[in-house]
């Protein structure tokens, strides 16, 4: 499987940090992604990639389309891939453990969340058809932060993923890419529920929020504990 990480040309320090912290993972390929400065929203609307009602910021548009372009690559070439944000830190045994996890899943899996931003809530079908779990991995208490994960071996379990509005690293299959492209495009500010049900909902402002609406309808999974984690000291793009 290809392993892509998204990092813009302007983020040279981020790219250097990513490659240094994740040097233990072979064959990582940088994906430049969509440039915020060169983003033509009107042209994207004409291509039916963005709706007129979408409230995303230019940076959120660029980040979303960077992921969507990789999904298109996966769907076109019918080859699953890993995709990471430019601030992701992968565990020391990511290669072996991710391979083991994928081999343990049904062959028709669509999406596997390796990790997200510490503190972000996720909901899992932890006892399928019986009980849900809602929680969050708290920010690292190590002085080194998420960087310490790069030297840590992790043994994980995959559970059906119901929702999360944060994505740091994931595997996506051709069927998953096709389903998410159809579900999330054109980008629009559909109302998404708040993490606290009592707070109602708000218009989506990121691709991750749109993706969260559809995990429960596809064969999506999340790993606990996570195999990667967002480095809070570094922005995603």
Where are the regions that the model predicts?
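An acidic/histidine-cluster motif and surrounding catalytic segment
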Residues: 1-84, 88-237
